[in-house]
């Protein structure tokens, strides 16, 4: 379970450039991340995700606001104090940033050597970490001899060498195929559970958030649009930015024409979760209410072992029939309904 706050971002603002060329990358960001949790930050390209995570370890210095990590105000530290504080913050990237002339083991040992560890101690720790990421058998391989997933495992092992309390993952799976992505996400979740490391995941991919995160913040044009548990945000998005991420695909014009041709009128989005995801809603509408609805689209996903999904329905054009259908659907447990005007591509 998540513990006390370990990262506190307060009124963080980051601008680039100046004068007429000034660009606001982040505006008044307030986020608290608790010890031991996996926290996701998601948004479309240009939302400010990578800038935000780089402000956590002060790779980017905020224009205004404060960042606290493990009880230290990062924005107030001297250069020497900042170097010391960064030892407790690991970071992995989309590009693996391995030293090509060093073996996997030598890459993992590198930060230990910089910290003054003896060669013997560094190698012992390096082998231990390669075993943790299931890559001990490839300790003598060079990066060019490793697959993308194996390179990322080496990068993860290397960032764990200094025993960080926080692991920042900036699009860490974006360059990987789907199967390798799942493997790396399972590894990150295992590290979180076994070592208690707090993980911050930056991604544009909802599936990554669904797979491993406990809570999530949606960034939109440099601001936090929504924040909450993954279940809350993905099952019932409250903002337009949230809906764009959770419901990215429109209904093709052809399906809308078919809906109208079959006597359909308004289009509604039904969001359901838990056991309700498998209730025969359409059949129940027809049997219990005598109302026929057209299915224009449906999607179900698994979040934390529970089924969540959405269904786009074309209601009858007749207002009485449509009202009866809406009353029936809204009476069901754990179901939310919203009308979707002009919902098409």
Predicted regions and their residues:
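Helix-to-loop junction immediately C-terminal to a conserved catalytic motif
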Residues: 57
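Conserved signature/switch motifs of ABC ATPase nucleotide-binding domains
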Residues: 141-144, 162, 169
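ABC ATPase "signature
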Residues: 227-228, 236
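Helix N-cap at the start of a conserved alpha-helix in ABC-type nucleotide-binding domains
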Residues: 178-180
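Short coil-to-helix segment of the ABC ATPase nucleotide-binding domain corresponding to the Q-loop/switch region
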Residues: 102-109
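Conserved ABC ATPase "signature" region
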Residues: 72-73, 109, 113, 120-137
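A short, surface-exposed alpha-helical micro-motif characterized by mixed small hydrophobic
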Residues: 209-211
